[in-house]
Structures are given as structure tokens and as C-alpha cells.
A protein has these predicted regions:
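Feature responds to low-complexity, polar/acidic, surface-exposed segments characteristic
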Residues: 130-197, 204-225, 232-257, 269-281, ...
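Short glycine/proline-rich, acidic loop/turn segments that cap or connect secondary-structure elements
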Residues: 261, 288-297
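Exported/extracytosolic protein signature
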Residues: 1-131
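DNA-binding alpha-helical recognition surfaces that contact promoter or target DNA
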Residues: 55, 168, 229, 289
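Short, surface-exposed secondary-structure boundary micro-motifs
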Residues: 39, 94, 112, 171-172, ...
């Protein structure tokens, strides 16, 4: 009798794919069109088979351009097929917001990627982009200031901002509940430091941390990388390898992943020479602008911020006014605000 030859068990072929979803801004008026870009890639050198990219769109939106994808309910699917090793791709699709029943509505869209191969390192197989829809027809809640000036009516927009100052701004702007003193101490911040409660709250909330030597360095100017990391942690963005690196000077930087996530979220941009300058210090004018973007606030028009060292021609005037004044406002079509008289 012939000897039966066992059928060999197929060895699963791994696939390591990534997807990156973004848009050109974070606030859109009701009944307007939103364009999303989906970037995807194959990180391995071998092909991935039966690759599918999907995008989930928010409720109260309709698909305007599915980019040759298949629409089913609130999901668009693209059958990519075989994706060669190290290959990349981009899909641009468009949706339209419906009429809103509130002045501001938080929304999000999600992109995912899958394959018939055995997926590995799946943290970057989905990407979420958060944005705000707004209506000019409905009054929004008044905005509360989150940053103060100095004596003699100065704002000092070109001064570098310290880690302690940013801790206070974030705790104030994000309305973080004051944390109990858990006993975690920094050897350079005692309970008599003016920002002690803010630092403790920011650290306990997980958005700030100290250094390996047990210091916090409250008076050190914060860097672009440090602020990017703090914002990413607040937004609970993933510390994952990006599908695409957009800046020439961050490839080996410790904060590369968070920098790319914050860039994807349209909170901090790079420079015209293709750099991000991760270790550059941040000015007060830059910081207030970034926090306003995080909150989808401003810039504020028709407002006098009252600072003698901030001319109305200053590039950040509207954001400085937004962050330093308690005010009621009407929203404009471009997302900016006009202060009510």
C-alpha cells in the first residue's frame, strides 16, 4: 500500500502594514466639505495579499467623493489587492457635514488596514482623526482665558515659555481637576513653588513627566518636542512608528513618533526648509497659538487684548487675544471668532 504523505501545514506569511489619516484642518462649518487623506504602507520587504483599507465617517455626514471605493452605511472600503514590499499609497476621499443642532460638535473619522496575511505589530493598523463641526447660527458658550500677561500690561510674546508655565496653562485650559498630592516629589520643586499644584496635576494626569535624575526643571524653557509629547499624551495618541516621516531632522529623535502624531492632528507645523526643530524652545506667542488650536478656539477678531507690547499686526495677535480674554463670540466660516461687543 502506498504510504500516505501528510499535507504540509502552510506557514503563515506575516504582514506589517500601517495607515495614517489626516485632513487639512480641525474645524469645519456645517454643510461644508471635508477632504481626508489616507496614507498606507507595507513595512516589510514581502508582498501583503488581499489588502483592504477602510474609512469610517461620522454620523450626520454623507460621502461626496469615495475615491472609487465602495460605500456601505458609514464605511468606505478600498480593495488594494496585493501590496508589494515597502510599497506606499494614498487615498483622498471627501465627505459633507450635515446641519448641526449645536454650536460645536466633536467628530472623528477612522481609517483601518487589513490583509489576508498574518498581521503583526498592529498598533498602527488604525488611525483616528478628530475634528470639530460648528454652526454659526447657534451661539457657543463663552470662552474663558487660560493665560495671563505681566505687570505694566505686557505679554512678552517673544519670551521663551517655561515648563512650569506650560503646566499651569494646560491645567487651566483643559480644566483638569486638581490632583491630590500623591507624594511623588521632584527634588527641584517643593510645595512652596508657585506652580507646585499645577505641576502635580499635570504629572498625575499623565501629560507631563520629570527627568531620570529626579528633577522637573520647572524654569527650563519647554521645547517643541516636549510640548508635542505632552499634547499627544493628553489626546491619548499612540507612540507608534509613522507611515511617513515629514521632517528631515527627527528621524533619530526620541519624540519622533509623537511629533508626527501631533503634526497629523494639525496642532504644530514644521518649517519651510523641511525641518521641525524639535529641540528649539517655544515662545509664549507660539504656545498660546498651539493651545488655541488644541481647543479649536480662535483666532479672535475685533478684540483689544490690552497688551502694550503686542501690536495688532503681530502674527499671533488673534490667538493672544483668544487665550488672554474672557469673551463671548460669534463663529466665522473659516473657524475664527469675532468678539461680541
Amino acid at each position: 500500500m502506498p504510504i500516505a504523505v501528510p499535507t504540509p501545514t502552510p506557514i503563515p506569511v506575516p504582514a506589517d502594514l500601517g495607515v495614517f489619516l489626516t485632513s487639512d484642518k480641525t474645524a469645519y462649518e456645517e454643510n461644508s466639505t471635508v477632504a481626508f487623506s489616507v496614507y498606507y504602507n507595507n513595512k516589510l520587504g514581502t508582498p501583503a495579499e488581499k489588502v483592504v483599507v477602510k474609512a469610517e465617517i461620522p454620523q450626520n455626514t454623507t460621502v461626496v467623493d469615495a475615491a472609487k471605493g465602495t460605500v456601505s452605511g458609514n464605511t468606505i472600503s478600498w480593495d488594494i489587492g496585493s501590496l508589494n514590499g515597502k510599497a506606499t499609497g494614498e487615498i483622498i476621499f471627501k465627505i459633507k457635514l450635515g446641519a448641526l443642532s449645536a454650536s460645536e460638535v466633536n467628530m472623528s473619522s477612522k481609517a483601518t488596514i487589513s490583509s489576508a496575511n498574518q498581521m503583526t505589530k498592529t498598533d498602527d493598523d488604525e488611525s483616528i482623526f478628530n475634528f470639530m463641526g460648528f454652526s454659526k447660527k447657534i451661539a457657543g458658550k463663552p470662552h474663558t482665558k487660560f493665560i495671563n500677561g505681566y505687570e505694566n500690561k505686557q505679554f512678552r510674546p517673544e519670551n521663551m515659555i517655561t515648563r512650569a508655565e506650560v503646566a499651569k496653562i494646560l491645567v487651566t485650559a483643559l480644566s483638569l481637576a486638581k490632583a491630590k498630592d500623591t507624594g511623588k516629589k521632584f527634588k527641584d520643586v517643593d510645595n512652596k513653588h508657585w506652580a507646585y499644584d499645577y505641576i502635580v496635576t499635570a504629572v498625575n494626569s499623565g501629560i507631563f513627566s520629570g527627568y531620570n535624575d529626579g528633577t522637573f526643571l520647572p524654569n527650563k524653557a519647554i521645547t517643541r518636542a516636549e510640548l508635542s509629547t505632552a499634547l499627544a499624551k493628553y489626546l491619548k495618541l499612540k507612540n507608534i512608528e509613522p507611515v511617513k516621516v515629514h521632517f528631515k531632522d527627527i528621524n533619530t529623535h526620541w519624540a519622533k513618533n509623537f511629533i508626527e502624531e501631533i503634526y497629523r492632528s494639525k496642532l504644530i507645523a514644521g518649517y519651510s526648509d523641511g525641518s521641525f526643530k524639535p529641540d528649539a524652545q517655544i515662545k509664549r506667542s507660539e504656545c498660546v497659538t498651539i493651545i488655541c488650536r488644541l481647543l479649536n478656539r480662535g483666532p479672535l477678531k475685533d478684540a483689544d487684548c490690552g497688551f502694550v507690547d503686542v501690536n495688532k499686526t503681530h502674527w499671533a495677535y488673534g490667538y493672544i487675544a483668544e487665550g488672554s480674554l474672557d469673551h463671548s463670540y460669534t463663529r466665522n466660516s473659516d473657524g475664527s471668532e469675532t468678539k461680541k461687543k
